[in-house]
Amino acid sequence: MNHTENLTNKDAIDKLKSLVEDILVCLFCTNLKTDDGATSRPMSALKVCDQGNVWFFSEKNSDKNQAIEADNKVQLFFSHPGKSRYLIVNGEAEIMFDKAKIEELWTPVAKIWFEQGKDDPDISVIKVTPNTAYYWDTDGNRMINLLKMAAS
């Protein structure tokens, strides 16, 4: 049996938060419109805020940041095969150099990529504002839910 449910506003954001917190690592895709296909790389989501934005750290001169500057449309693919949960987020990315936001999002694990810590000159923050998100929660091989989420 296949069930579809549309969530908006707070319900959508709450569901997005719970899924991202459970999965954390996603494939972060840029260059969505190229003939060679999208460019994807694994990224750890830091937080989903109350507005529904998904936050990441990135090196300021990375290929990813350059791709976002050229075209800010992105897709995030989260997958938890052990729990049969899958999430796709379509949105727009913005690169920021906000020290207060870096301080807010900082975790000790981030020092693996940014050896100088919160003050590393190469650190940037990426904010992904979702336009839509689709979530599948399956029980074995059976589809249970497909949720369409639109963050406000």
Please name every model-derived segment.
Residues 18-35, 74-78:
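A short, Trp-centered hydrophobic/proline-enriched beta-strand micro-motif
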Residues 31-33, 59-61, 79-81, 90-94:
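Histidine- and/or cysteine-centered catalytic micro-motif in compact active-site loops
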Residues 36-43:
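A positional/architectural concept
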